[in-house]
Amino acid sequence: MSPCENDTPINWKRNLIVAWLGCFLTGAAFSLVMPFLPLYVEQLGVTGHSALNMWSGIVFSITFLFSAIASPFWGGLADRKGRKLMLLRSALGMGIVMVLMGLAQNIWQFLILRALLGLLGGFVPNANALIATQVPRNKSGWALGTLSTGGVSGALLGPMAGGLLADSYGLRPVFFITASVLILCFFVTLFCIREKFQPVSKKEMLHMREVVTSLKNPKLVLSLFVTTLIIQVATGSIAPILTLYVRELAGNVSNVAFISGMIASVPGVAALLSAPRLGKLGDRIGPEKILITALIFSVLLLIPMSYVQTPLQLGILRFLLGAADGALLPAVQTLLVYNSSNQIAGRIFSYNQSFRDIGNVTGPLMGAAISANYGFRAVFLVTAGVVLFNAVYSWNSLRRRRIPQVSN
């Protein structure tokens, strides 16, 4: 970074727009390949229904598992070298891996590359850390809520675009198109994101114990990590059974896939609408109130999902659930900002990402196990119980310690 750039004030609003675009592109890139992942596994030589299901589950989950392992390392490096560098590393690394995925010749190569994708990821948590350290604290809720809509938008559009591209050009070319999107993200970040960061030597870096002692409220921060994990468990538990549940509700109709896709997408649309607004409200009344209210509202929506009789009823409830979900993670992230310093923001957001990834792995496993033993409807009731526990646990953690007063 040039000296003149160091002297120029950073326009955090511009950085927010560019980071939003980066999260959108990476969200779209990740979800582009999701619709045909089992088909690509089959193309790589896996045959048989049970083997195909097993390998599809493994190659899907391994990315999140390795992301959970690698996130703390990248977070520490971000606190030493800067968050922009980590954004560039992530976008370029994932782009190269996507090219190699399109060239994979067998399932083992593909599995290793999916693990490598998880190891080299981390664009979103580093974007969160970058914006969190630049935005005025009293606007954190709105900024992080707005930023979260970037990844959600990309994840919504990605599957549709991926399906169309796969039908038009075949499976392998989609990986190369995805790589191009990630390379575009790299250049957008390189030329448009600005950061004032003074590199820190390894000796000056805070060790884990010092990170914990530097937190304003270590127990609260840990409880927020657990809250993130449970939010993802609750979200992921429904994913494996949603299409089958819709088919059970719809009966003999020809467009079950379309109806399922619509019902799967509506929470994301609702989150897009609610996240910035509820984030802004959280800046006024406190993110802790938004978090607890959204968790309780989620419980009240999950329970009737177990008793719906039509796909329309399920779709309406999932739309409302998406509106609540849009507030949850931004509220958690805002509370993390309030309870940590800029010096350790990279690690705090990366630890939070690790818990999120663990939830992404365990949620679908929990949902599949419950539905196999007790039926589809039981999944919603158990998930409601998990979220209710989360609400009580979060309320108890927040009640014990007063949230620090936020100033400009």
Curated annotation (Swiss-Prot):
GO molecular function: transmembrane transporter activity
Any one Gene Ontology cellular component term annotated for this protein: plasma membrane
Pfam families, A to Z: MFS_1 (PF07690)
Record field: transmembrane: 16-36, 58-78, 92-112, 115-135, 146-166, 173-193, 224-244, 256-276, 290-310, 319-339, 378-398
Subcellular location: Cell inner membrane
Role: Confers resistance to fosfomycin and deoxycholate.
One GO term of the biological process aspect: response to paraquat
Name of the coding gene: mdtG
Name of the featured protein: Multidrug resistance protein MdtG
Record organism: Escherichia coli (strain K12)
HAMAP family tied to this protein: MFS_MdtG
Keywords tagged on the record: Antibiotic resistance, Cell inner membrane, Cell membrane, Membrane, Transmembrane, Transmembrane helix, Transport
Homology family: Belongs to the major facilitator superfamily. DHA1 family. MdtG (TC 2.A.1.2.20) subfamily.
UniProt cross-references to NCBIfam families, sorted A to Z: PRK09874.1
Entry keyword DNA-binding: no
Membrane topology: Multi-pass membrane protein
InterPro entries tied to this protein: MFS (IPR011701), MFS_dom (IPR020846), MFS_MdtG_subfamily (IPR050497), MFS_trans_sf (IPR036259), Mutidrug-R_MdtG (IPR023692), Tet-R_TetA/multi-R_MdtG-like (IPR001958)
